[in-house]
Amino acid sequence: MNILFAVSECVPFVKSGGLADVAGALPKELKKLGVDVRIILPNYSLIPQKLRDGCTLHKVINVPLGWRNQYCGILKGEQDGITYYLIDNEYYFKRDSLYGHYDDGERFSYFSKAVLECIPHLDFEVDVLHSHDWHTAMVNFLLREKYQDNPLYERIKTVYTIHNLQFQGVFPPEVMYDLLELGDEYFHSKQLEFYGNVNFMKGGIIASDQITAVSPTYKEEIQYEFFGEKLDGLLRKYNDKLSGIVNGIDTSVYNPETDSYIKAQYDAESLYEKSENKRALQRYFGLPEKEDTPIISMVTRLTKQKGLDLVRTVFREIMEEDVQCIILGSGDSEYEQFFEWMAYEYPEKVKVYIGFNEELAHQVYAGSDLFLMPSLFEPCGLGQLIALAYGTIPIVRETGGLNDTVHSYDEETGEGNGFSFTNFNAHDMLHTIHRAIEFYHDKPVWEQLVKQAMTEDYSWEQSALAYKELYKSLME
């Protein structure tokens, strides 16, 4: 079974979000199941030179893009037993950021065409082409509409994964006409047209043999208007080929037993070492070293989606509790400034790190007691999974993957691995925080809750099995 992942980012090469984590970890787990997964992505100038040096030139071809042919170098390399192909074109990929350029429509039209033009020149036969998010959605669409009659492509099946429906790749019609050479028959509501523009993600949804969302709850949510980003009707139409498969975490990277970034390694039977991580975190930020004061942390993009309006509304009420708060992340200036002001107002209780620091993030996960994630929507979420693996109990809103992975503690049965609330309401969140703090001070209950969190399986194993079955169903 040969699978080609077409992605715009992938760990360890480049990362801007959770897509890169999925593209880096899922293929490794699928390989353990006997699936040959290879990955194709742009050869960005942002890729570390050491990784670029590990690739060799496999082939040079021309890619037709509208009225012209564009250079395409196919580089080939291997990392952790996985084969990678990098599409080389400095005009499109020698940039100071992955996305957000005036010509993104052209850049990813080129990449989509390049993926398809490369397939006959790769040294393996593709059974399933698996595209991800808007950046490679048109690979699947173009395969069906322009390449399917070619014997080299006719047996290839397609899967399309929606990681975040909010970002759809919407561009002027000229992209479709001039670059992709698609005529008027594609510019209507049953094809690519979307409120006067062209929508790449819509093309992926329409053309793919199977569609997955990154959690079962998110799969249901995106079929409703509130979460559907104007594509809910289309997703309801194609419900029969839509499924939800929850993401996992790479346990070779996020594992408190082996993590070299944290002060003291530990497992569910050596939680006293977790306390050492808490002290180290307090020392790092200059917080009072108070063992019985819970640390509530957030490692997040500071954006509206992450529920920060709820946090902002009741933050001073949270501060009335005996707690310490640590926020690590960057994003919208209004939230950055708010948390910096709170750190100034509560210097003994609040610390903020604007930016991202991988090593510090690991220490925050290991040293905190509670992890706050009150998202407005959350397709899957990785933060809560990492927190659970480190025995840091999540407080989440019941949406998307948060609803699938965090099960609210039930004091009657003792079951659960975290705390959750349903409505997007600041005082519902505050009540849940109070409840979590109350149980934090009941040490036997808390220790049991932490052990339950740490002993569940958050790896990619079950998800990889589900993807393998999906691929298998397409090939039968």
Curated annotation (Swiss-Prot):
Family assignment from sequence similarity: Belongs to the glycosyltransferase 1 family. Bacterial/plant glycogen synthase subfamily.
EC number: 2.4.1.21
Top-level taxon of origin: Bacteria
Keywords assigned: Glycogen biosynthesis, Glycosyltransferase, Transferase
Pathway: Glycan biosynthesis; glycogen biosynthesis
InterPro entries: Glyco_trans_1, GS/SS, Starch_synth_cat_dom
GO terms of molecular function: alpha-1,4-glucan glucosyltransferase (ADP-glucose donor) activity; alpha-1,4-glucan glucosyltransferase (UDP-glucose donor) activity
Annotated binding of ADP-alpha-D-glucose, by residue: 15
Protein name: Glycogen synthase
One GO BP annotation of this record: glycogen biosynthetic process
Functional description taken from the UniProt entry: Synthesizes alpha-1,4-glucan chains using ADP-glucose.
Catalytic activity: [(1->4)-alpha-D-glucosyl](n) + ADP-alpha-D-glucose = [(1->4)-alpha-D-glucosyl](n+1) + ADP + H(+)
Gene: glgA
Top EC group: transferase
